[in-house]
């Protein structure tokens, strides 16, 4: 868990998936973490590398895997906050609510990511008092979620969404965050939400960790 949360974002999704069965594990749930450990051992020289002189600008990637949990059909949120060319904060977590569409799942993931980015911005302004309030770009590959976040009006398609997720609309209106569309192939938070083929996994891992 420490590796997944502190130094190896490339293991976060696998550790999250296995951790769900920690209470009543079976043989399969034992073999899987062994595979994760073998991967970590074989890539023990990998680590997060920051670029000197690249500034303190924060950018974020938000993604969701809709209804991926078979038992209760809950989706998975994934988010990564980048600074100085590499990931400084990331998460892979099962959403606490059951969402009714891919757009809604992505919207909830956006809210989770923006909360993490807000905290990091508070830390930055505490360490660097003259830093000021920056506008943080959040990259999202779902146009529906992007439009929903930028629309201050609740419609029949969004009025059921829990109000705690709508705070991001005010932040976008104030100009504190901007949601930018990114192609799915370049959605680097994908590695935090779902299993990927080897090529895609390495591409996103190398980007987040600046390998």
Name each region found by the language model:
Residues 38-64, 129-132:
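Structured nucleic-acid-interacting core domains from mobile-element enzymes and related host factors
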Residues 60-103:
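RNase H-like nuclease fold core
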